[in-house]
Amino acid sequence: MNYEGHLKGHRGWVTSLACPQQAGSYIKVVSTSRDGTVISWKANPDRHSVDSDYGLPNHRLEGHTGFVSCVSLAHATDYALTASWDRSIRMWDLRNGQCQRKFLKHTKDVLAVAFSPDDRLIVSAGRDNVIRVWNVAGECMHEFLRDGHEDWVSSICFSPSLEHPIVVSGSWDNTIKVWNVNGGKCERTLKGHSNYVSTVTVSPDGSLCASGGKDGAALLWDLSTGEQLFKINVESPINQIGFSPNRFWMCVATERSLSVYDLESKAVIAELTPDGAKPSECISIAWSADGNTLYSGHKDNLIRVWSISDAE
Protein backbone atom coordinates (compact mmCIF):
# COMPACT_ATOMS: atom_id res chain seq x y z
CA MET A 1 0.00 0.00 0.00
CA ASN A 2 1.20 3.50 -0.80
CA TYR A 3 1.24 6.54 1.46
CA GLU A 4 -0.60 9.36 -0.36
CA GLY A 5 -0.48 12.24 2.12
CA HIS A 6 -2.38 13.67 5.06
CA LEU A 7 -5.39 15.74 6.08
CA LYS A 8 -4.63 18.56 8.51
CA GLY A 9 -7.31 20.47 10.39
CA HIS A 10 -7.90 19.02 13.85
CA ARG A 11 -6.32 20.40 17.02
CA GLY A 12 -6.65 17.17 19.00
CA TRP A 13 -6.42 13.39 18.57
CA VAL A 14 -8.43 12.04 15.62
CA THR A 15 -10.74 9.68 17.47
CA SER A 16 -13.00 8.26 14.75
CA LEU A 17 -13.33 8.12 10.96
CA ALA A 18 -16.11 7.10 8.56
CA CYS A 19 -16.37 7.04 4.77
CA PRO A 20 -19.57 7.56 2.75
CA GLN A 21 -21.05 4.42 1.21
CA GLN A 22 -22.52 6.21 -1.81
CA ALA A 23 -20.44 5.89 -4.98
CA GLY A 24 -19.10 9.19 -6.21
CA SER A 25 -19.67 11.12 -2.98
CA TYR A 26 -17.81 14.44 -2.96
CA ILE A 27 -17.22 13.89 0.78
CA LYS A 28 -14.29 11.50 1.08
CA VAL A 29 -14.18 10.96 4.85
CA VAL A 30 -15.65 12.40 8.06
CA SER A 31 -13.53 12.69 11.20
CA THR A 32 -14.06 13.39 14.90
CA SER A 33 -11.55 14.68 17.40
CA ARG A 34 -10.74 15.46 20.98
CA ASP A 35 -10.82 19.12 19.90
CA GLY A 36 -14.63 18.83 20.10
CA THR A 37 -15.22 19.17 16.36
CA VAL A 38 -16.24 17.03 13.40
CA ILE A 39 -14.83 17.67 9.91
CA SER A 40 -16.14 16.49 6.55
CA TRP A 41 -13.33 16.35 3.98
CA LYS A 42 -13.32 16.78 0.21
CA ALA A 43 -10.53 16.04 -2.24
CA ASN A 44 -7.87 18.69 -2.80
CA PRO A 45 -7.44 19.36 -6.55
CA ASP A 46 -3.75 20.07 -5.86
CA ARG A 47 -3.25 17.00 -3.66
CA HIS A 48 -0.47 15.58 -5.85
CA SER A 49 1.69 18.71 -5.70
CA VAL A 50 4.52 19.00 -3.19
CA ASP A 51 3.52 19.94 0.39
CA SER A 52 -0.21 20.02 -0.43
CA ASP A 53 -2.70 18.40 1.94
CA TYR A 54 -4.44 15.38 0.42
CA GLY A 55 -7.88 16.77 1.29
CA LEU A 56 -9.53 20.00 2.40
CA PRO A 57 -12.21 20.60 5.06
CA ASN A 58 -15.67 20.89 3.49
CA HIS A 59 -17.49 21.70 6.74
CA ARG A 60 -16.32 21.91 10.34
CA LEU A 61 -19.23 20.78 12.52
CA GLU A 62 -19.21 22.53 15.88
CA GLY A 63 -21.51 22.25 18.88
CA HIS A 64 -20.31 19.43 21.11
CA THR A 65 -18.89 20.64 24.43
CA GLY A 66 -16.63 17.64 25.07
CA PHE A 67 -14.35 15.25 23.19
CA VAL A 68 -16.12 13.75 20.16
CA SER A 69 -15.56 10.00 20.33
CA CYS A 70 -17.35 8.40 17.38
CA VAL A 71 -18.95 9.09 14.00
CA SER A 72 -21.35 6.99 11.91
CA LEU A 73 -22.64 7.92 8.46
CA ALA A 74 -26.06 7.11 7.03
CA HIS A 75 -25.90 4.62 4.19
CA ALA A 76 -28.25 6.39 1.76
CA THR A 77 -28.36 10.05 2.85
CA ASP A 78 -25.96 12.87 3.73
CA TYR A 79 -26.44 12.56 7.49
CA ALA A 80 -23.88 11.83 10.19
CA LEU A 81 -24.20 10.83 13.83
CA THR A 82 -21.61 11.78 16.43
CA ALA A 83 -21.14 10.67 20.03
CA SER A 84 -19.45 12.83 22.64
CA TRP A 85 -18.14 12.97 26.17
CA ASP A 86 -20.70 15.76 26.68
CA ARG A 87 -23.21 12.87 27.11
CA SER A 88 -25.02 13.66 23.86
CA ILE A 89 -25.42 12.29 20.37
CA ARG A 90 -25.95 14.72 17.50
CA MET A 91 -27.27 14.23 13.99
CA TRP A 92 -25.75 16.48 11.32
CA ASP A 93 -26.64 17.37 7.74
CA LEU A 94 -23.33 17.11 5.89
CA ARG A 95 -24.62 19.24 3.01
CA ASN A 96 -24.67 22.38 5.16
CA GLY A 97 -22.82 21.35 8.32
CA GLN A 98 -25.83 22.04 10.55
CA CYS A 99 -26.90 20.04 13.60
CA GLN A 100 -30.39 18.65 12.97
CA ARG A 101 -31.09 16.89 16.25
CA LYS A 102 -29.72 16.03 19.70
CA PHE A 103 -30.24 12.70 21.44
CA LEU A 104 -30.18 13.08 25.22
CA LYS A 105 -30.56 10.23 27.68
CA HIS A 106 -27.08 8.94 28.45
CA THR A 107 -25.92 9.85 31.94
CA LYS A 108 -22.18 9.65 31.23
CA ASP A 109 -19.77 10.01 28.28
CA VAL A 110 -21.09 8.47 25.04
CA LEU A 111 -18.35 6.40 23.40
CA ALA A 112 -20.05 4.75 20.42
CA VAL A 113 -22.91 5.32 17.99
CA ALA A 114 -24.08 3.60 14.78
CA PHE A 115 -26.79 3.80 12.14
CA SER A 116 -28.70 0.62 11.28
CA PRO A 117 -28.25 -0.70 7.70
CA ASP A 118 -31.58 0.86 6.63
CA ASP A 119 -30.82 4.15 8.49
CA ARG A 120 -34.06 3.85 10.49
CA LEU A 121 -32.54 3.01 13.86
CA ILE A 122 -29.60 4.30 15.86
CA VAL A 123 -27.72 2.48 18.60
CA SER A 124 -25.48 4.16 21.17
CA ALA A 125 -23.46 3.23 24.24
CA GLY A 126 -20.87 4.55 26.64
CA ARG A 127 -19.71 4.92 30.21
CA ASP A 128 -23.16 4.47 31.78
CA ASN A 129 -22.89 0.79 30.62
CA VAL A 130 -26.30 0.98 28.87
CA ILE A 131 -26.95 0.34 25.17
CA ARG A 132 -29.80 2.47 23.82
CA VAL A 133 -31.79 2.14 20.60
CA TRP A 134 -33.31 5.28 19.09
CA ASN A 135 -35.43 6.22 16.12
CA VAL A 136 -34.22 9.02 13.87
CA ALA A 137 -36.70 11.43 15.48
CA GLY A 138 -34.61 11.24 18.65
CA GLU A 139 -36.89 9.01 20.72
CA CYS A 140 -35.22 6.33 22.85
CA MET A 141 -37.12 3.14 22.04
CA HIS A 142 -35.21 0.46 23.97
CA GLU A 143 -32.53 0.12 26.60
CA PHE A 144 -30.63 -3.17 26.71
CA LEU A 145 -30.56 -3.75 30.46
CA ARG A 146 -31.16 -7.47 30.98
CA ASP A 147 -27.91 -9.47 30.63
CA GLY A 148 -26.19 -6.17 29.88
CA HIS A 149 -22.55 -5.21 30.21
CA GLU A 150 -21.05 -4.69 33.65
CA ASP A 151 -18.64 -1.93 32.62
CA TRP A 152 -18.18 0.78 29.97
CA VAL A 153 -19.39 -0.11 26.47
CA SER A 154 -16.57 1.06 24.23
CA SER A 155 -17.66 -0.06 20.76
CA ILE A 156 -20.90 -0.96 18.99
CA CYS A 157 -21.98 -1.84 15.47
CA PHE A 158 -24.83 -3.31 13.45
CA SER A 159 -24.60 -6.43 11.34
CA PRO A 160 -25.45 -5.58 7.70
CA SER A 161 -28.40 -8.02 7.71
CA LEU A 162 -31.82 -6.37 7.35
CA GLU A 163 -33.74 -9.62 7.93
CA HIS A 164 -32.25 -10.29 11.36
CA PRO A 165 -31.13 -6.97 12.89
CA ILE A 166 -28.16 -7.73 15.12
CA VAL A 167 -26.05 -5.38 17.23
CA VAL A 168 -22.59 -6.34 18.49
CA SER A 169 -21.07 -4.55 21.49
CA GLY A 170 -17.64 -4.62 23.12
CA SER A 171 -16.98 -3.63 26.71
CA TRP A 172 -14.48 -2.97 29.44
CA ASP A 173 -15.96 -6.05 31.18
CA ASN A 174 -13.77 -8.05 28.69
CA THR A 175 -16.78 -9.43 26.77
CA ILE A 176 -18.54 -9.01 23.44
CA LYS A 177 -22.32 -9.33 23.34
CA VAL A 178 -24.59 -10.10 20.39
CA TRP A 179 -28.06 -8.56 20.62
CA ASN A 180 -31.34 -9.07 18.81
CA VAL A 181 -32.45 -5.50 18.15
CA ASN A 182 -36.16 -6.18 17.84
CA GLY A 183 -36.50 -7.97 21.16
CA GLY A 184 -33.63 -6.30 22.99
CA LYS A 185 -32.41 -9.77 23.95
CA CYS A 186 -28.78 -10.75 24.42
CA GLU A 187 -28.40 -13.76 22.14
CA ARG A 188 -24.88 -14.66 23.26
CA THR A 189 -21.88 -13.41 25.17
CA LEU A 190 -18.47 -13.98 23.58
CA LYS A 191 -15.63 -14.53 26.03
CA GLY A 192 -12.00 -14.74 24.98
CA HIS A 193 -10.30 -11.49 25.95
CA SER A 194 -8.28 -11.19 29.15
CA ASN A 195 -8.65 -7.41 29.36
CA TYR A 196 -11.00 -4.69 28.15
CA VAL A 197 -12.39 -4.73 24.60
CA SER A 198 -11.88 -1.46 22.72
CA THR A 199 -13.18 -2.35 19.25
CA VAL A 200 -15.71 -4.65 17.60
CA THR A 201 -16.61 -4.78 13.92
CA VAL A 202 -18.66 -7.02 11.63
CA SER A 203 -17.53 -8.23 8.21
CA PRO A 204 -19.30 -6.87 5.10
CA ASP A 205 -21.23 -10.12 4.59
CA GLY A 206 -22.31 -10.26 8.23
CA SER A 207 -20.76 -13.67 8.90
CA LEU A 208 -17.76 -12.65 11.01
CA CYS A 209 -17.04 -10.43 13.98
CA ALA A 210 -13.58 -9.18 14.89
CA SER A 211 -12.68 -7.83 18.32
CA GLY A 212 -9.58 -6.34 19.89
CA GLY A 213 -8.44 -4.56 23.01
CA LYS A 214 -5.93 -4.10 25.77
CA ASP A 215 -4.69 -7.71 25.73
CA GLY A 216 -3.20 -7.31 22.24
CA ALA A 217 -5.26 -10.13 20.73
CA ALA A 218 -7.39 -9.77 17.61
CA LEU A 219 -10.11 -12.42 17.80
CA LEU A 220 -12.26 -13.53 14.89
CA TRP A 221 -15.69 -14.98 15.66
CA ASP A 222 -18.43 -16.78 13.74
CA LEU A 223 -21.33 -14.42 14.36
CA SER A 224 -24.04 -17.04 13.87
CA THR A 225 -22.62 -19.58 16.36
CA GLY A 226 -20.40 -17.47 18.63
CA GLU A 227 -17.46 -19.79 17.94
CA GLN A 228 -14.00 -18.26 18.14
CA LEU A 229 -12.40 -19.05 14.78
CA PHE A 230 -8.88 -17.85 15.39
CA LYS A 231 -6.68 -15.43 17.28
CA ILE A 232 -3.91 -13.11 16.09
CA ASN A 233 -1.51 -11.91 18.77
CA VAL A 234 -0.28 -8.44 17.83
CA GLU A 235 1.53 -7.95 21.17
CA SER A 236 0.32 -4.39 21.63
CA PRO A 237 -3.02 -2.95 22.81
CA ILE A 238 -5.45 -2.71 19.89
CA ASN A 239 -7.25 0.58 19.25
CA GLN A 240 -9.38 -0.33 16.22
CA ILE A 241 -10.00 -3.08 13.68
CA GLY A 242 -11.58 -2.60 10.25
CA PHE A 243 -12.54 -5.15 7.59
CA SER A 244 -11.83 -4.28 3.97
CA PRO A 245 -15.17 -3.91 2.14
CA ASN A 246 -14.13 -6.07 -0.82
CA ARG A 247 -11.02 -8.07 0.05
CA PHE A 248 -10.47 -10.74 2.71
CA TRP A 249 -8.31 -8.28 4.65
CA MET A 250 -8.41 -6.77 8.10
CA CYS A 251 -6.62 -3.60 9.21
CA VAL A 252 -5.46 -3.49 12.84
CA ALA A 253 -4.40 -0.26 14.55
CA THR A 254 -2.40 -0.75 17.75
CA GLU A 255 -0.36 1.42 20.11
CA ARG A 256 2.75 0.47 18.14
CA SER A 257 1.72 -0.27 14.56
CA LEU A 258 -0.79 -0.03 11.71
CA SER A 259 -0.98 -3.33 9.84
CA VAL A 260 -3.11 -5.05 7.21
CA TYR A 261 -3.66 -8.80 7.56
CA ASP A 262 -4.75 -11.34 4.98
CA LEU A 263 -7.42 -13.37 6.79
CA GLU A 264 -6.79 -16.57 4.84
CA SER A 265 -3.07 -16.73 5.58
CA LYS A 266 -3.38 -14.78 8.88
CA ALA A 267 -0.20 -13.01 7.77
CA VAL A 268 0.69 -9.32 7.66
CA ILE A 269 0.65 -8.11 4.06
CA ALA A 270 1.37 -4.44 4.80
CA GLU A 271 2.96 -2.47 7.63
CA LEU A 272 1.91 1.13 7.10
CA THR A 273 4.54 3.75 7.91
CA PRO A 274 4.76 7.01 5.93
CA ASP A 275 8.12 7.46 4.21
CA GLY A 276 9.79 4.95 6.50
CA ALA A 277 9.24 7.15 9.55
CA LYS A 278 7.66 5.98 12.77
CA PRO A 279 4.28 7.74 12.82
CA SER A 280 2.23 8.87 15.74
CA GLU A 281 -0.01 6.22 17.31
CA CYS A 282 -3.04 5.37 15.16
CA ILE A 283 -6.34 5.30 17.05
CA SER A 284 -8.92 5.23 14.23
CA ILE A 285 -9.28 3.79 10.72
CA ALA A 286 -11.81 3.70 7.87
CA TRP A 287 -11.84 2.10 4.42
CA SER A 288 -13.38 3.87 1.44
CA ALA A 289 -16.47 2.18 -0.02
CA ASP A 290 -14.49 0.82 -2.98
CA GLY A 291 -11.80 -0.59 -0.68
CA ASN A 292 -9.01 1.20 -2.54
CA THR A 293 -8.24 3.84 0.10
CA LEU A 294 -7.57 3.54 3.83
CA TYR A 295 -7.72 6.54 6.18
CA SER A 296 -5.96 6.46 9.55
CA GLY A 297 -6.42 8.93 12.42
CA HIS A 298 -3.55 9.65 14.79
CA LYS A 299 -2.58 11.19 18.11
CA ASP A 300 -0.57 13.90 16.30
CA ASN A 301 -3.95 15.30 15.09
CA LEU A 302 -3.39 14.20 11.46
CA ILE A 303 -5.33 11.86 9.19
CA ARG A 304 -3.09 9.83 6.89
CA VAL A 305 -4.21 8.45 3.54
CA TRP A 306 -3.10 5.12 2.03
CA SER A 307 -3.92 3.68 -1.39
CA ILE A 308 -3.81 0.15 -2.73
CA SER A 309 -1.48 -0.30 -5.68
CA ASP A 310 -2.75 -2.12 -8.77
CA ALA A 311 -0.63 -5.16 -7.97
CA GLU A 312 -2.45 -5.70 -4.70
UniProtKB/Swiss-Prot annotation:
GO terms for molecular function: ribosome binding; translation regulator activity. Gene3D superfamilies: YVTN repeat-like/Quinoprotein amine dehydrogenase (2.130.10.10). The keyword Repeat applies. Transmembrane segments: none annotated. Keywords: Repeat, Ribonucleoprotein, Ribosomal protein, WD repeat. WD repeats lie at residues 9-42, 63-93, 105-135, 148-180, 192-222, 233-262, 279-307. SMART domains: WD40. GO terms for cellular component: ribonucleoprotein complex; ribosome. CDD domains: WD40 (cd00200). PANTHER family: RECEPTOR FOR ACTIVATED PROTEIN KINASE C RACK1 (PTHR19868). Belongs to the WD repeat G protein beta family. Ribosomal protein RACK1 subfamily. This is Small ribosomal subunit protein RACK1. It comes from Leishmania major.
